[in-house]
Amino acid sequence: GEVGRTLSADDYDLERLFDRDGCQILHISGLIAALSPETTDCCLKVARRAKQSGTRVCFDLNHRASFWKGREAELRAAFHEIASLADVLVGNEEDFQLALGVEGPEAGGSGIYGKTDAFKHMIGRVRALYPDASAFATTLREVYSANCHGWGAILLAGDTWHMEPLREIQIMDRIGGGDAFARAA
């Protein structure tokens, strides 16, 4: 809500988190980074501080067009900087295209499993832009019906590709599925 729009890096004891407590990994959601100019600044400052302390950064792009409206240039620059600090980049095909401007396969649709090479090429382009990251993950989702999807994933970790083939899953509520994937990546 509205309180979340006012998050500031000053709200957190970054020295304690990163230096004294030894936070091992920082996860940043693109939803929070795009929520308001204040949260964008917060995410940038926290990501910079994490890297300064040697903490790994995971960035889930999580692009939402409504959050970007009227702030496209500002957010593209901020997302580029956070991505350049990230050790792990997570996003679906739309996230990589819309948040980072990386060419990728057509979003959604059927026959997604047959397009895995296009997803790998997209990840390769992301890796070329952000060579300091060590892992890149994307979901593969094919919608069969409102309550039934095929869901899989592709991960490039170092130089090794990992792929989880599409599995048919029953959908009770779509909210949070991508977030759960990003946290596990």
Language-model-detected regions and their locations in the chain:
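Surface-exposed amphipathic alpha-helices with a cationic face
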Residues: 44-51, 127
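Conserved phosphate/ATP/ADP-binding segment of small-molecule kinases
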Residues: 53, 66-159
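Short beta-strand/loop segments at the ligand-binding rim of alpha/beta enzyme cores
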Residues: 54-62
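Short, small-residue alpha-helix embedded
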Residues: 172-185
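Surface-exposed cleft-lining segments at the edges of enzyme active sites
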Residues: 29-36, 64-67, 109-111
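Glycine/charged-rich beta-loop-alpha catalytic/anionic-binding loops adjacent to active sites
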Residues: 28, 159-170
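Structural motif
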Residues: 25-27, 58, 90, 137
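Conserved phosphate-binding/catalytic loop of the ribokinase/pfkB sugar-kinase fold
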Residues: 1-41
